[in-house]
């Protein structure tokens, strides 16, 4: 293999996407219009909601879809694909339509976060990568948002590159963490590529390279006098590290009139050490010195530290964020929901399972979110058939699609359609926002959720309801396929 060849993401697909596509071609079904939804079934960490992320990379992937000569040669060498199909792939481009929720949107189980309408082969071949990028980044953005909410307004930085599961895991993970609310990253290339603010302090190796900790601190502050952060736990945090930091601040920063500085702890009892360090710094007149901590943090440890009164201004969160260690899989799936017949009529499709939670919602659909006009808070999400509209000037009865006797009348509300057009006829029609805009949007949308939905433990179930028309179509399909 030519290692200088740029990775062609078109071939980043499960092999059965290609065998099915060859089969569609052999059956003359390659141009049949299909509809697929991406959705997930459970929120990671038993949370109340997830955060959508990864759309920008999905857009770039779709724009670049093509098979080159090396790809065709490889497929021909497998002796499984017809020559006519391989010639078809030579001219392959995406010509379909895509709708998706914007990145940073809070999302809930069993509602579509992306819908693809395209000829059968096109829709089939994009499955793997779309799931890959949306699953990964939504997972990390969701975890980051949990961590950021646990920090209660304190700065959170993503520190996980060296523990990430591969290069893309680090680079795109930092991007997703920023969407979820982290203020920056230690991953330099994520700043270069996406504008995620990169920063860092020093490692223990810097301190060990000098004859004394004081000399290491003094040298560092002389090189970087603007807001330096010193790692104080290389030897003895309270007896040596903090006193050496105070001495350095007094000798290097104070004469220059500089007050912004910080210390970082990466080991030990963070509650005890930060309380003691805070008092030492304050007594020395360095109330402006920020205390940062790292070391295998997650939302639960951060919450416990703050409940115990730890004096912490900033958290550096690494492995448990970048790998979403507590639940490292986001279970997004890609399911066929409808096809078009020769006359252009949309025929709903359903996937049935003995596991009720795996039964799909059929048809080409719209997704609405209802907001209370008096509170601005999200009330429920509402799935309906593509040709339905919601008139929010009138009361609307909604019901639990599984326990249909549970009903509620929604009034004084605003209905907002969540899915927006991304591609039409293979052309990008969506203006991609900046990463900072996505982060701000995410924070604003999370604020529309009730605190009960945002609980870490046993959150309130946020309802995703079906319109009566959609529920009836689903019920009819279930009855037809159970006879």
Summary of predicted features, one role per range:
Residues 78-86, 166, 394-402:
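Short, positively charged
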Residues 73-74, 142-146, 160, 454-461:
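Short coil/turn segments at secondary-structure boundaries
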Residues 2-32, 36, 45-47, 52, ...:
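Gly/Ser/Thr/Ala-enriched C-terminal appendages of enzymes
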Residues 1-33, 42-44, 80, 86-95, ...:
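Buried, small/hydrophobic-residue-enriched core segments of structured protein domains
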Residues 204, 294, 318:
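Residue-level "edge-of-site" marker
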Residues 199, 263, 291, 313-315:
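Hydrophobic residues within beta-strands of alpha/beta enzymes
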Residues 34-90, 99:
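N-terminal, Lys/Arg-enriched amphipathic/low-complexity engagement segments
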Residues 57, 139, 434-438:
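Short amphipathic alpha-helical segments
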């Amino acid at each position: 293999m030519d290692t200088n060849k740029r990775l062609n993401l078109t071939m980043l697909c499960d092999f059965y996407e290609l065998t099915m596509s060859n089969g569609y071609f052999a059956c003359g079904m390659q141009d049949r219009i299909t509809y697929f939804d991406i959705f997930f079934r459970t929120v990671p960490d038993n949370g109340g909601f997830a955060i959508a992320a990864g759309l920008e990379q999905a857009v770039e992937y779709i724009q670049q879809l093509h098979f080159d000569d090396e790809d065709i040669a490889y497929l021909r060498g497998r002796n499984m694909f017809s020559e006519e199909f391989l010639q078809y792939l030579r001219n392959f481009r995406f010509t379909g339509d895509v709708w998706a929720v914007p990145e940073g949107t809070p999302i809930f189980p069993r509602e579509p976060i992306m819908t693809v309408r395209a000829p059968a082969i096109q829709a089939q071949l994009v499955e793997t990568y779309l799931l890959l990028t949306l699953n990964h980044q939504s997972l990390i953005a969701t975890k980051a948002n949990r961590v950021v909410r646990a920090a209660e307004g304190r700065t959170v930085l993503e520190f996980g590159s060296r523990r990430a599961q591969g290069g893309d895991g680090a680079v795109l993970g930092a991007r997703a963490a920023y969407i979820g609310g982290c203020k920056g990253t230690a991953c330099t290339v994520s700043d270069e590529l996406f504008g995620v603010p990169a920063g860092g302090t020093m490692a223990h190796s810097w301190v060990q390279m000098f004859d004394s900790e004081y000399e290491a601190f003094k040298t560092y502050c002389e090189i970087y006098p603007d807001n330096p952060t010193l790692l104080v736990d290389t030897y003895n945090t309270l007896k040596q590290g903090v006193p050496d930091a105070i001495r350095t601040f007094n000798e290097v920063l104070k004469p220059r009139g500089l007050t912004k500085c910080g210390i970082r702890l990466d080991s030990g009892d963070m509650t005890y050490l930060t309380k003691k360090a805070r008092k030492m710094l304050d007594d020395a007149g360095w109330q402006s010195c920020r205390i940062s901590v790292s070391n295998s943090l997650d939302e639960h440890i951060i919450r416990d530290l703050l409940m115990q009164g730890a004096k912490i201004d900033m958290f550096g969160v690494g492995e448990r964020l970048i790998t979403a260690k507590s639940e490292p899989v986001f279970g997004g799936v890609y399911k066929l929901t409808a096809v078009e017949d020769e006359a252009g009529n949309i025929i709903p499709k359903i996937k049935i399972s003995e596991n009720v939670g795996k039964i799909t919602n059929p048809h080409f659909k719209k997704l609405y979110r209802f907001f209370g006009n008096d509170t601005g808070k999200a009330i429920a999400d509402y799935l309906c058939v593509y040709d339905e509209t919601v008139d929010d000037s009138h009361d609307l009865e909604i019901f639990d699609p599984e326990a249909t006797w549970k009903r509620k009348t929604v009034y004084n509300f605003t209905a907002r359609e969540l899915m927006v057009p991304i591609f039409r006829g293979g052309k990008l029609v969506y203006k991609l926002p900046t990463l900072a805009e996505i982060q701000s949007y995410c924070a604003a949308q999370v604020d529309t959720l009730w605190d009960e939905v945002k609980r870490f433990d046993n959150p309130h179930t946020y309802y995703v309801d079906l319109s009566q028309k959609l529920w009836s179509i689903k019920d009819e399909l279930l009855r037809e396929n159970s006879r």
